[in-house]
C-alpha cells in the first residue's frame, strides 16, 4: 500500500509542477524542441529533424523505461516541448498521466498506433493500481523491428511537418533517406540471421519478440516476465529445463538489469550468457543502426 500511495503522490506532484511550469515557459527558439522517451526515438527525431530540431532524451542511457521514475527535470523538459515521442502500448506508464497536464500545443506521437502488435505480454510495473491495465497491454518493443521503424519515421515526419509546415519538404526528404537505410538494415539482418545454426534462445525480458517474428527466430523462454521482478523458483526451474533441451544453450541478458539471475540460470543449465542492448544510446551503439548491428554481432557470436 505504501508503494501505491508513494507513486500516486509522485504523479500528483509532477502534474502540479508541470501545470505551474506552463506559465514560465519561454518562447520557443528557432529549433523545434522534441522530447523522446528512449534513445531510438531520439535518434529517429534527429535523423528526420536534422538541424531544425533540438532533441532531448528523457531516459539516461542504461535506464529501463519499465522501472523508470520521473524527476522534476523530466517534468520541465515535457513542459517546454513541442513534440513528445513515445513508444506507447503501456511502456511509458510513468509519463501517460503527466501528459494530461502538458501544454495544449504539444503534439504527442504514439509510435505503436497502427502497428501490428504482438498480444498478451505482461508488463506489471509493481504498482497495484496499474496491474489490470499493464497486464493487458501488447508487447511495446516495436522498435527492434527495423521495418516497423519505417512506420515510426513516417509518424515523426508528419508531426514535424504539422508543427513546422514551412520545412515539410526538408523533413520528407530526410525521412525518405533514413527509411531507405532502415530497409537496407533489414536486408542485412535477414541475410545474416539465416545463417544461425540455432534459432531459439532465452531472453532476460520480453524485448525480442518483434525481432524474432521478423527474422524467423524464437524466444524459447523469458526470465523476468514482469520487468523488475525476480522470477519465482518454479519459473526458474522451468527455464533451466527448456535450456537443457536446446542444441545451443544461450541466455541473453541486458545492461539495463542485473545479470545475477541470468548467470545463475545459465550456470545451472550449462548455458552461456551474452548481453543484448534493446535501447542503445551508449558508446558504440549510440544510434539506432549502430545498436542493431551491435546486437546482431552478439547474436551471431552466440547462435552461429
Residue ranges and their predicted role:
Residues 16-20:
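Hydrophobic helical h-region of N-terminal Sec-dependent signal peptides
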Amino acid at each position: 500500500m505504501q508503494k501505491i500511495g508513494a507513486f500516486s503522490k509522485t504523479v500528483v506532484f509532477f502534474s502540479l509542477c508541470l501545470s505551474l511550469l506552463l506559465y514560465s515557459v519561454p518562447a520557443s527558439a528557432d529549433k523545434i524542441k522534441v522530447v523522446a522517451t528512449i534513445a531510438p526515438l531520439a535518434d529517429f527525431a534527429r535523423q528526420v529533424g536534422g538541424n531544425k530540431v533540438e532533441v532531448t532524451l528523457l531516459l539516461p542511457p542504461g535506464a529501463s523505461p519499465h522501472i523508470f521514475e520521473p524527476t522534476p527535470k523530466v517534468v520541465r523538459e515535457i513542459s517546454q516541448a513541442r513534440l513528445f515521442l513515445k513508444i506507447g502500448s503501456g511502456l511509458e506508464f510513468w509519463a501517460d498521466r503527466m501528459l494530461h497536464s502538458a501544454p495544449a500545443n504539444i503534439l504527442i506521437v504514439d509510435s505503436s498506433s497502427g502497428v501490428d502488435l504482438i498480444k498478451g505480454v505482461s508488463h506489471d510495473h509493481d504498482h497495484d493500481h496499474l496491474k489490470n491495465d499493464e497486464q493487458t497491454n501488447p508487447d511495446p518493443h516495436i522498435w527492434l523491428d527495423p521495418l516497423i521503424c519505417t512506420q515510426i519515421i513516417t509518424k515523426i515526419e508528419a508531426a514535424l511537418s504539422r508543427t513546422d509546415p514551412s520545412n515539410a519538404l526538408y523533413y520528407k526528404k530526410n525521412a525518405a533517406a533514413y527509411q531507405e537505410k532502415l530497409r537496407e538494415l533489414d536486408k542485412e539482418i535477414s541475410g545474416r540471421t539465416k545463417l544461425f545454426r540455432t534459432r531459439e534462445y532465452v531472453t532476460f525480458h520480453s524485448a525480442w519478440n518483434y525481432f524474432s517474428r521478423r527474422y524467423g527466430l524464437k524466444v524459447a523462454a523469458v526470465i523476468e516476465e514482469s520487468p523488475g521482478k525476480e522470477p519465482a523458483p518454479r519459473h526458474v526451474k522451468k527455464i533451466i529445463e527448456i535450456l537443457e533441451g536446446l542444441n545451443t544453450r544461450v541466455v541473453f541478458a541486458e545492461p539495463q538489469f542485473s545479470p545475477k539471475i541470468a548467470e545463475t540460470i545459465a550456470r545451472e543449465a550449462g548455458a552461456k550468457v551474452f548481453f543484448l542492448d534493446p535501447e542503445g544510446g551508449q558508446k558504440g551503439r549510440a544510434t539506432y543502426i549502430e545498436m542493431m548491428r551491435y546486437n546482431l554481432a552478439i547474436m551471431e557470436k552466440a547462435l552461429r
